[in-house]
Design a protein with these regions (language model features):
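Charged, compositionally biased non-catalytic regions
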Residues: 155-176, 249-267, 356-375, 379-386
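Long, charge-dense tracts
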Residues: 175-180, 208, 216-344
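Low-complexity, small/polar and acidic-rich linker and loop segments
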Residues: 2-185, 189, 199-201, 205-217
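Amphipathic, membrane-inserting segments
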Residues: 476-521, 747, 758, 763-812
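Short linear, low-complexity motifs centered on an aromatic residue
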Residues: 193-210, 448-462, 677-685, 782-788
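Small-residue (glycine/alanine-rich) low-complexity segments and short Gly/Pro motifs
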Residues: 678-792
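Hydrophobic, often aromatic-rich secondary-structure segments at membrane interfaces
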Residues: 312-431, 435-729
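Structured, mid-chain assembly/scaffold modules that mediate subunit interfaces
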Residues: 142-248, 428, 436-439, 468, ...
Length: 812
């Protein structure tokens, strides 16, 4: 009956004036709606109701598209006006600032797309953790094993599908409900920004995928042990076939393939597209409302992200263990990350961000031509050229396309090589990181606090080892999340890589054992709390009476007089020792009238008020997040853009630049952020302040670099170097990062068998040069030298052996 009804509808659509593509879309949506109802046999009345529902949804999509177009135009015009006003002398820098921020002392110069993405992500994570604590299931979530996670997943699916919950354990039910409800909250937030994402059970955890597992499906599924080795091989074709064979029985085929004609060929093409997209990491690209995961609006387009609907939660859980985020927790945080990046992008650039940014650039260029500023117009034109303009390297960072894979084998083995080199060379990174204390104090000085107080704050936090539970919660609501949760420590010294599960876990363990995890987390936590206390102390001061330094700090993030005089009146957080801290979460408690007043609009819908409140909160959170990574230097999107130039992993140029940039992310971040912060005073007309800032940065780096260098010498059993010697002073500046150029072994000396050029080019080429030297010795008959060099090369590239405490014992 159902097939006859659908055939009749199809015939009517063919005879109507509706375009073929649109007619097929309507029919596909009816089929999908049929699958969603879980009813096998449909009569004409039910099919008619489904058709009515589909038509209503398509009418809603039309309204959403119109609203998106209107709101996009407002964002575009506002951004154009902002760039022309604040960056009148350098509009190209203004466009870069929109994407990745700028050090120039302009209103909102740090409130970039990249920072909005980070702020939304952290806000989502912090809000989720608060929900876990509120429902007293945070410990269960943190310690859940595979069996518990499977049962939690069942609850998530049952809640999402509005069916009876079968789980008997109350805590597991509570945890499942919290995740399901929070998933819905995030999905609705997507839709607030212009998406039309359908309700899916477990939507937030469905977006994770491991391209390395997919590409090795034969091995992952252990097929070689089950069949003749000649029959099963690891070719790309066999891997995709193995993946299809595994996933197809687990899929709700009516729902998954609703936008196809259902033929075996169409299903096969659908799965081919999905597989190829996943192994290239294309599902991690954020591209706005229409193409977001689960979006209805572009479901019929070839480029839309494929949604794989599973029959049951167990089917999803089994698949995820093999080819997804491995476990529920990792899949959940992957989903949070994608949500934060997409929402942050849309909040700044609208529902079609890539297209809208180019339109912004074009409008800026046109206005400059009208203003007879031809030179600036040409620079802007070059910057916004598609595929080759200067903006590409920054856009690739914020939309994630730089992390897509174009050449799987090259990306995999190059990433593994760089991971091994990191774990073989960074064992003493925490000793070298002593210079962080100086950089920390310089940032506090820039904020308007004292340098000596900054040194004391950093050392005091390191000496404390661990904060009280209450202060940890306060730091968390300001956006602090420990690096052992977000796993970004490796990116501090390199451009970051996509790694398979095993190497990712090994690398996490390494950074815990070398002490860098504790060091970085402690200083970040201290920077957050210190700044939170500093801002709270200013709350009784009206905007016009603020110190120039503090006013400069907040205006960098678009916090003007109107905003400051509202947020300073909010309640503060109080720790057990009586200290007061600014409360970012209290922004959620601001009344709708206050939000409307800040927006300057009296008539706002509930959705618009929610968006305005979210944007205010993430702007304030962004201030704490951004400045904490100036205090504890980390490469931001701007730094990574210059290091990778938007080049994809797996390509020749992409891998070459990644090898070259290994271990250079941190020193380049010092140049871009710490030095750039001081040089920004030049553009602001304060030349003497710029000179003093640079001089203090370099001299302080030399002092702390000498301390670090001496500590490493003592660990090696050497005497401290003469501080008066010119070479020592120069080495100390390098060690402390004052000149902004690290050698690849964190200022180790260049080996005799390698060239300076190879060392500058990166550790990969350095080690390759050493291997070449071995063969060179062999051809000359100098076998003892070849053996010695071979021994050194092996010893120096064994992961974990160079941990500073192990290396001291090993060398001894």
């Amino acid at each position: 009956m159902a097939d006859k009804c659908l055939t009749r509808i199809e015939n009517v659509l063919k005879k109507s004036s509706i375009a073929t593509e649109k007619a097929q879309s309507i029919l596909n949506d009816i089929k999908k709606a049929q699958s969603e109802t879980k009813i096998a046999d449909l009569d004409e009345t039910i099919v008619s109701k489904l058709a009515d529902g589909v038509l209503k949804r398509q009418q809603i999509q039309k309204k959403i598209n119109k609203l998106n177009a209107l709101e996009d135009e407002v964002k575009i015009r506002n951004t154009v006006d902002y760039v022309l006003k604040e960056f009148s002398s350098n509009p190209t820098e203004g466009l870069a600032a929109v994407l990745v921020g700028s050090n120039l002392q302009k209103q909102g110069s740090r409130s970039s797309v990249a920072l909005a993405q980070l702020s939304y992500y952290r806000d989502i994570v912090v809000s989720f953790q608060a929900k876990l604590s509120e429902n007293k299931v945070n410990t269960l979530f943190a310690e859940a094993n595979a069996d518990i996670e499977r049962r939690v997943s069942r609850v998530i699916w049952e809640v999402g599908n509005d069916v009876k919950i079968t789980e008997k354990n109350k805590d597991i039910v509570t945890l499942g409900k919290v995740i399901a409800e929070f998933s819905e909250t995030v999905r609705k937030k997507y839709n607030d920004y212009g998406a039309n994402t359908e309700k899916l059970a477990g939507w937030i955890v469905r977006q994770s995928s491991d391209p390395f597992q997919l590409r090795n499906a034969v091995d992952v599924l252990n097929l070689k042990n089950k069949k003749n080795i000649k029959e099963i091989n690891g070719t790309p074709e066999r891997n995709v076939a193995a993946w299809k064979e595994y996933i197809l029985p687990k899929l709700d085929q009516k729902r998954t393939f609703a936008n196809t004609d259902g033929s075996p060929q169409a299903i096969d093409e659908f799965l081919d597209f999905a597989y190829n997209s996943l192994i290239k990491n294309q599902n991690q690209v954020v591209d706005g409302a229409g193409n977001s995961f689960g979006s209805r609006s572009l479901a019929e387009r070839i480029g839309a992200k494929r949604v794989l609907h599973f029959n049951t939660s167990d089917d999803w859980f089994d698949y995820n263990a093999m080819f997804g985020g491995k476990n529920l927790k990792e899949s959940l945080f992957d989903g949070f990350n994608m949500a934060g990046r997409n929402i942050g992008m849309m909040s700044m650039l609208g529902s079609n961000p890539q297209k809208n940014f180019l339109k912004i650039g074009d409008l800026v260029k046109r206005q400059l031509i009208l203003n007879k500023k031809q030179g600036q117009a040409e620079k802007v034109g070059n910057f916004i050229q598609e595929k080759q303009g200067g903006y590409v390297k920054f856009m690739a960072e914020v939309d994630g396309s730089v992390n897509t894979i174009n050449g799987f084998a090259a990306a995999k083995w190059s990433g593994i090589t760089r991971s091994i080199l990191s774990m073989a060379k960074l064992g003493g990174a925490v000793v070298s990181a002593i210079a962080d204390v100086h950089l920390y104090a310089r940032e506090l000085k820039w904020q308007g606090r004292s340098y000596v107080g900054g040194v004391a704050e950093a050392l005091g936090r390191l000496a404390k080892i661990k904060n009280s539970k209450q202060k940890a919660e306060i730091a968390e609501q300001l956006g602090f999340i420990a690096d052992n949760l977000v796993y970004d420590l490796a990116a501090r010294y390199s451009g970051s890589d996509n790694l398979n599960r095993n190497f990712t876990q090994i690398q996490r363990t390494f950074f815990k054992l070398n002490g860098l995890s504790w060091w970085t987390n402690s200083l970040k936590d201290g920077a957050m709390l210190g700044m939170g206390n500093y801002v709270a102390k200013q709350r009784k001061i009206p905007f016009n009476n603020l110190t120039p330094e503090f006013k400069r700090l907040i205006t960098h993030f678009g916090i003007n007089e109107k905003i400051w005089n509202v947020i300073r009146k909010m309640d503060v957080e109080r720790a057990d020792d009586g200290k007061e801290f600014f409360s970012a979460r209290n922004i959620d408690n601001l009344s709708d009238d206050v939000i409307k007043n800040l927006s300057g609009v009296t008539k706002m819908s509930k959705r618009q008020v929610t968006i305005a409140r979210d944007n205010l909160k993430t702007r304030v959170l962004g201030m704490f997040l951004d400045r904490s990574t100036y205090a504890v230097i980390e490469p931001d999107a701007r730094t990574r853009g210059y290091l990778k130039f938007g080049l994809q992993a797996g390509t020749g140029p992409g891998e070459a630049i990644r090898f070259f940039s290994q271990f250079k992310a941190f020193p380049y971040a010092i140049i871009n952020r710490a030095l750039g912060r001081e040089l920004a005073f030049l553009e602001a007309g304060q030349k003497m302040r710029a000179f003093q800032g640079v001089a203090n940065l370099v001299i302080g780096s030399a002092i702390f670099g000498y301390i670090s260098m001496t500590a490493k010498d003592l660990l090696k059993g050497k005497k401290p170097r003469d501080p008066i010697n010119k070479k020592t002073f120069f080495s100390a500046m390098l060690q402390g990062g004052g000149l902004g150029i690290y050698t690849d072994f964190l200022f180790g000396q260049i080996q005799q068998s390698t060239s300076a050029l190879a060392t500058i080019a990166g550790p990969g080429l350095t080690e390759a040069t050493k291997v070449a030297a071995i063969f060179n010795y062999i051809t000359k008959g100098e076998f003892s030298k070849a053996g010695k060099q071979g021994y050194l090369s092996i010893k120096e590239n064994i992961p974990f052996l160079n941990l500073f405490y192990l290396k001291t014992a090993f060398d001894y």
